[in-house]
Amino acid sequence: MAWSPQQDDALAAVAAWLRRRDTQVFRLFGYAGTGKTTLARHLAEGVDGDVIFGAFTGKAASVLRAKGCPGAATLHSLIYRARESEGESPTFVLNRESPAAKAALIVIDECSMVDEELGRDLLSFGTPVLVLGDPAQLPPVKGGGFFTDAEPDVMLTEVHRQARDNPIIRMSMAVREGESLPHGTYGESRIIGKRDIDAETVMRADQVLVGLNRTRRAYNNRIRNLMGFRDAMPAAGEKLVCLRNNKQKGLLNGGTWLVKEFATSRSKKKVVTMRVQSEEDARHVVKVSVPQEFFDGREER
């Protein structure tokens, strides 16, 4: 494959780091379409030993597999293991027998999502870690940033020609350069005015992203009302987003879960207890207890 001069320099820098072994982490950052994953896959082919590909979410791991990174999995599944407990749900502990302990290299995509606890657990294996990140990517609302709190060792800025044909990448380039995007259709994406957003448009969507918590609350209340929900507490089948890590239960900030069973609402303690199922792994079902204020709009008061 023909590499650009910038990509050639990146390959040489990572190869030199692998030879030196003077630091455990190498930060290869770049905008979308600059070829970070392609470079990492090429480097992995030349490593003497096993290379593990991982990402924070299952969706990101599936994208890695689609790009030719075999066995890519979530970081949680790579380094933690379930342990039987007396409760209804298993607990998760660091797996010292993880393949991460014997690998020659760990490659982590979308590293901005990794927080300090997960990052330190990853580094505890002593394995060299190549982290891939995009400085233009929005960071998580809470947590994350363990690997992005330092300057990149290599920063890729040249978007290759094939990527420029992708409408989403073209839009991201325009926004990054301060340009406004006119209303219209961009591949499978559409940009419309605020006045054009109606109930039918919203109800066809899988998710709605907004910029403010008060907007989120208003949209959630309206959508749930349109769906026939009258109680502020979650119902079976609804989707929830995890806001805080709980390693013992296998909960990660930003993960999405489906309510399987609403158990109890204890008014004295003002806690909601329910069973939830991971959207990424249907086998992962846990029992959680959450303060009621997270569902009735009082979490920030």
Task: Indicate residue ranges for each PLM-predicted region.
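Conserved helicase motor core of P-loop NTPases
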Residues: 3-5, 10-36, 120-127, 132-296
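Hydrophobic positions on the alpha1 helix immediately C-terminal to the Walker A/P-loop
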Residues: 39, 43
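Post-Walker A helix-loop "phosphate-sensing" segment adjacent to the P-loop in P-loop NTPases
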Residues: 45-53
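Conserved acidic residues
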Residues: 51, 104, 206
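Inter-Walker segment of RecA-like/P-loop motor cores
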Residues: 54-102
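Hydrophobic "anchor" residues on beta-strands that sit immediately upstream
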Residues: 70, 105-106, 130
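Catalytic P-loop NTPase motifs of RecA-like helicase/translocase cores
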Residues: 79, 113-116, 138-139
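Walker B catalytic acidic pair
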Residues: 109-110, 133
